[in-house]
Amino acid sequence: MSENNKAILEAANAAIAQGNYEGFLSFCTDDTEWTFVGDRTLKGKAAVRQWMATEYVEPPLNIVANLIAEGDFVTALGDFTIKDEDGKAAYYSYCDIWRFRGDKMVELRAFVIPAEVKAETSNAA
């Protein structure tokens, strides 16, 4: 079951990367609950859909460093970049803990912190 849950999360993330937010939501239960620790809780697909519409002006760039699965849980560690309406990028590091019910994502506890991007150095004179 754990490997199957990892594959489901990877497929859901691929939908997000393509801007297919409804495709992503098809992997969630109707009563899905997302808790952004220290920020807010979204209850149900409609709330998540509305949040995505405002937060994902364009698909985020998500770099998953690790996926760890055990039982009904998959933990994802990584970094992502989102752009606002003006095209300004914001960078974050995260730890998402997903709980599955059957083959659907039912609960998310997300720990998200702003990250600084190190300036690239150049040898150009």
Q: At which residue positions do the language-model features occur?
A:
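A beta-strand edge to alpha-helix "cap/lid" segment located at domain peripheries
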Residues: 1-14, 35, 39-42, 47-125
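Short, well-ordered alpha-helical segments enriched in acidic and aromatic residues
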Residues: 18-35
